[in-house]
Structures are given as C-alpha cells and as structure tokens.
Amino acid sequence: MPRSLKKGPFVDEHLLNKVDAQNEAGTKQVIKTWSRRSTILPDFIGHTFAVHDGRKHVPVFVEDSMVGHKLGEFAPTKTFKGHVKDDKKGRR
C-alpha cells in the first residue's frame, strides 16, 4: 500500500540537511548514507549519493526519472553470479 498523500514523502532529516547545505554552498560532493528508505526529492537531482548495500557504498547519481523512488532501489543488496551450466560430461 502506498504512503498517504497527506503525510508526504519520507526523507531522513540528516540527509535533507546535507543536501540543503550543499545546495546553498553550490557544491556537488558525494553524500554517504545508510538511509535506503528515503524518498528521492526534486532537490536531490544532480547529486551523487553513496548508498550502503550492506557491504559497501554504491554510488547513485540522481536524475529526473528517479524522483519519487527510494534510494535503496538503485543499490542492489544481492549479487547474482549466474546459473551454473549443467555439464554432466565434466563430472566424470
């Protein structure tokens, strides 16, 4: 079920403060965050976030099409190595 419109999008306060500070200063440094649950706002466009995936920080550059999604959607937590080929000749 989606979040109520009356509540508005959820963004961690510390993350919003970091983005506002960079917007005022006019800088575009990488913002390291563990907040995968924060919604991407239009103020975030053009910034790069280092989103934690449980092991390392994945760089995510925010574009127009990402607004309204969560930061965690762009930093996958599981690495898919591929399926092993069923090679019965090699087992003998």
Curated annotation (Swiss-Prot):
**InterPro entries reported in the protein's UniProt record:** Ribosomal_uS19 (IPR002222), Ribosomal_uS19_bac-type (IPR005732), Ribosomal_uS19_CS (IPR020934), Ribosomal_uS19_SF (IPR023575)
Which keywords does the record carry? Answer: Ribonucleoprotein, Ribosomal protein, RNA-binding, rRNA-binding
**Entries under PROSITE patterns matching the protein:** RIBOSOMAL_S19
Query: In which domain of life is the source organism classified?
Result: Bacteria
* A GO CC term attached to the entry: small ribosomal subunit
Per the UniProt entry, what are the Gene Ontology biological process annotations, in alphabetical order? Answer: ribosomal small subunit assembly; translation
Entry keyword annotation includes Nucleotide-binding? no
UniProt GO molecular function: rRNA binding; structural constituent of ribosome
Which protein family is it in?
Belongs to the universal ribosomal protein uS19 family.
Described function: Protein S19 forms a complex with S13 that binds strongly to the 16S ribosomal RNA.
Q: What protein name is recorded for this chain? A: Small ribosomal subunit protein uS19
Q: What does the organism's lineage look like at the top?
A: Bacteria, Bacillati, Actinomycetota, Actinomycetes, Mycobacteriales
